[in-house]
């Protein structure tokens, strides 16, 4: 009996130990993160909140992480959509911040998390397809205090075969609404609707890509009636919307209505068509005087009149009826236009008070070679006939545009050289002129050796502009160059991705009034975004929902903020949201579109770089300073030759060795700009001194592929850096290649915003994206990523230098 009782006692003790151990194991598994991971999680979450909390709250936030327990109240979160890369969930709204994490069983990988701001109900968490997770959540107050963790649902492994039926496309339909903005401005708003295929098919990623407007993208949260609104579409634009859901991506092409398809727009707007296919040619008669022929295509809708203007050392205009398609300026004296000089021709189509125009530039043919033949009296008749035939042949040579490797010696017309024929005061030819009293000047936003740029307001509409002017006591050469720049900007015309002329004052104190881009230059914009990426991802986590927060509702303590602001521009905007891979790819495409326009106008930029591209409030990129030299440069970026500075790290090999500048040399520079964008503001050739660059390029060296860049995108860069200019792609081809990349399913396949330097795969795969993004080490070292403490200059402060043109 005693032995049986003792045996029973031992059994009970052993059973109790087993039960205690099992219970302890269950409790330990219910606690969300392991202690080591909890430390990393608290760092990343608290630093993410640091942008909206003060310094004391940051310390409290870390302490609260250590003291948080487990709540008996279950979480209200529900998984609504699941794909191979993420889940999207819905929760109850709260007046507090909510923190959601994904715990993987028996694994010590970093923990994906997301923060949802007060009163929001949807969120997204990054997953890996072949893993099983559990969601945990908690609340945080405005001081960073955490409540107890609440246990949420299990997220099962994603089975793509069961989730994604084959060959299913969404039926996308659209309707457009015509909007009158005032001031003779019009736009289109589009609404796109598509079907769903069941309860698991309720979440979508949308990208809208148009030829003439910015790409727009959005996440569609769970809804049984999905739709997407696109505002501010351009009339007569070709677009494509991508709807990515559980069944893959459906691409729907559409074209926005033209003004002529909308009765209200047609009646109220009636913009004359821009003259197309403008061709110009000059020939010289036997007296040495010039005739310039101008021809253009017949428009679909005839304007009231045409105003055709030629500018050389004089201005001459002709008014023509609306059915005209050709005219000739005859008997221009060689005192106004000489051989081998540049001239500009503008064709304005005019209806009422509205005008559209196209401008072209060309060189007159070289000096005539007069051949005088001496002959004897007996052979005089034959020699005279031969001489006459030679002169007639030479006298009617046509002009052809040709490449200029040096700046042409162009002169602007003097006031007493102006000759105007058949033009009335206030007509289309002087519509650029703005009275100086209409421009209200504000603070200086840029300053160079020769000029100053101020932010301005243009009356009466109150439009923000950038006003460029010369400094006090300019030289005659500076005034001449400034006026040449003014005429050049008139002739370039308007494009969505080129900084356009708003107006000018051509009086004694000339002014250039241009578009104002509030976010400054692209290089500073990229680097400010990089600062945000580094600060938000210092440890081992990625908060993929922060970019959707309304930061205007949050309290920011400026005395503790980490934000670095370039005071030359309003850079608070870039510091509020980080860029996405889709943004970076769109930036490359926008620059290609702007350069395609300049190349079509036979304009060579010669200084294409991220610092020479401006960013507007809505992330539209505009190429600036095309064809101009800059005053101030970053150290080791420009090499002095005579009185000119050269952007050696952006220049093509032939430009460095032979000073040849063509559109194809701009293509080389564009490849460097792509590299700047992919590296989010990195300095090119970080390991190569400028003095050794030419030797390195000649030997075949090219910048290696950035670790966060895919092979297809890097192949585009390498194609731009081909040693043979003829073998480089053209800008239309680059535009098409970037369109093809954007049309693919996921921009993350081509660019990631952070990389794992421990493993550094040459081509990051999509399933590795989150792991690379949440690792704690930075992808670029201080030595290879040069960042100036202060901006070296801005895009408006370049000295005006004459434009270079190609054939």
Swiss-Prot record:
May be auto-phosphorylated on tyrosine residues. Gene3D superfamilies: Phosphorylase Kinase, domain 1, Transferase(Phosphotransferase) domain 1. It comes from the Eukaryota. Residues 439-738 form the Protein kinase domain. This is Tyrosine-protein kinase receptor torso. It is a single-pass type I membrane protein. It is found in: Cell membrane. It comes from Bombyx mori (Silk moth). Its main location: membrane.
């Amino acid at each position: 009996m005693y032995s049986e009782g003792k045996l029973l006692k031992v059994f009970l003790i052993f059973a109790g130990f087993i039960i205690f151990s099992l219970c302890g194991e269950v409790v330990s598994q219910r606690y969300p993160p392991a202690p080591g991971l909890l430390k990393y999680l608290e760092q990343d979450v608290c630093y993410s909140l640091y942008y909206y909390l003060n310094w004391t709250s940051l310390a409290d936030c870390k302490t609260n992480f250590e003291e948080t327990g487990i709540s008996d109240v279950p979480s209200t979160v529900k998984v609504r959509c699941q794909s191979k890369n993420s889940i999207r969930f819905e929760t109850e709204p709260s007046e507090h911040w909510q923190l959601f994490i994904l715990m993987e069983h028996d694994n010590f990988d970093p923990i994906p998390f997301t923060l949802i701001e007060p009163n929001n109900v949807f969120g997204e968490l990054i997953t890996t397809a072949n893993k099983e997770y559990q969601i945990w959540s908690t609340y945080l107050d405005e001081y960073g205090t955490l409540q107890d963790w609440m246990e949420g649902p299990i997220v099962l492994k994603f089975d793509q075969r069961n989730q994604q039926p084959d060959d299913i496309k969404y039926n996308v339909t659209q309707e457009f609404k015509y909007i009158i903005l005032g001031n003779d401005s019009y736009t289109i708003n589009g609404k796109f609707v598509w079907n769903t295929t069941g309860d698991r098919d309720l979440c979508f990623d949308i990208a809208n890509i148009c030829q003439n407007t910015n790409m727009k993208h959005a996440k569609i949260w769970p809804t049984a009636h999905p739709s997407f609104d696109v505002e501010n579409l351009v009339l007569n634009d070709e677009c494509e919307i991508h709807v990515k859901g559980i069944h893959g991506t459906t691409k729907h092409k559409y074209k926005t209505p033209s003004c002529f398809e909308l009765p209200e727009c047609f009646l109220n707007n009636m913009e004359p068509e821009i003259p197309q296919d403008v061709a110009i040619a000059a020939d010289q008669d036997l007296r040495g005087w010039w005739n310039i022929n101008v021809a253009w295509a017949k428009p679909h809708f005839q304007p009231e009149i045409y105003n055709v203007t030629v500018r050389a050392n004089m201005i001459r205009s002709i008014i023509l009826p609306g059915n005209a398609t050709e005219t000739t300026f005859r008997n221009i004296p060689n005192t106004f236009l000489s051989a081998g000089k540049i001239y500009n021709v503008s064709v304005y189509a005019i209806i009422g008070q509205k005008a559209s125009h196209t401008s072209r530039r060309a060189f007159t043919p070289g000096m005539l070679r007069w051949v005088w033949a001496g002959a004897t009296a007996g052979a005089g008749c034959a020699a005279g006939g031969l001489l006459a035939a030679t002169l007639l042949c030479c006298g009617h040579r046509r002009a052809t545009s040709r490449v200029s490797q040096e700046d042409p010696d162009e002169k602007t017309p003097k006031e007493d050289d102006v000759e105007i024929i058949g033009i009335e005061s206030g007509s289309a030819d002087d519509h650029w002129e703005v009275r100086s009293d209409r421009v209200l000047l504000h603070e200086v936003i840029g300053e160079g050796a020769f000029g100053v740029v101020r932010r301005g307001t243009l009356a009466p509409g109150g439009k923000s502009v950038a006003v460029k002017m010369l400094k006090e006591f300019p030289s005659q050469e500076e005034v001449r160059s400034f006026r040449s720049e003014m005429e050049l900007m008139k002739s370039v015309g308007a494009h969505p991705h080129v900084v356009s002329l708003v107006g000018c004052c051509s009086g004694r104190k000339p002014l250039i009034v241009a578009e104002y881009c509030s976010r400054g230059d692209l290089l500073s914009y990229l680097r400010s975004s990089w600062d945000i990426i580094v600060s938000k991802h210092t440890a081992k986590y990625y908060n993929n929902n922060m970019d959707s927060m309304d930061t205007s509702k949050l309290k920011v303590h400026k005395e503790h903020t980490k934000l670095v602001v370039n005071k030359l521009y309003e850079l608070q905007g870039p510091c509020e949201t980080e860029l996405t891979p889709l943004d970076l790819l769109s930036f490359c495409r926008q620059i290609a579109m702007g350069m395609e326009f300049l190349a079509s106008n036979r304009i060579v930029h010669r200084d294409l770089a991220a610092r020479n591209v401006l960013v507007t409030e809505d992330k539209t990129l505009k190429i600036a300073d095309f064809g101009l030299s800059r005053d101030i440069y970053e150290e080791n970026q420009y090499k002095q030759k005579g009185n000119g500075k050269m952007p050696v790290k952006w220049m093509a090999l032939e430009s460095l060795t032979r000073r040849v500048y063509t559109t194809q040399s701009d293509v080389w520079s564009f490849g460097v700009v792509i590299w700047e964008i992919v590296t989010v503001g990195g300095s090119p050739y970080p390991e190569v001194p400028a003095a050794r660059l030419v030797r390195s390029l000649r030997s075949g060296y090219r910048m290696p592929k950035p670790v966060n860049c895919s092979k297809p995108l890097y192949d585009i860069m390498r194609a731009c850096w081909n040693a043979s200019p003829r073998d480089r792609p053209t800008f239309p081809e680059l535009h098409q290649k970037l369109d093809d990349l954007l049309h693919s399913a996921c921009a993350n396949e081509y660019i990631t915003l952070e990389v794992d330097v421990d493993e550094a795969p040459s081509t990051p795969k999509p399933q590795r994206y989150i792991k690379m993004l949440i690792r704690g080490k930075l992808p670029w070292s201080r030595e290879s990523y040069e960042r100036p403490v202060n901006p070296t200059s801005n895009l408006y402060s370049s000295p005006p230098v004459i434009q270079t043109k190609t054939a």
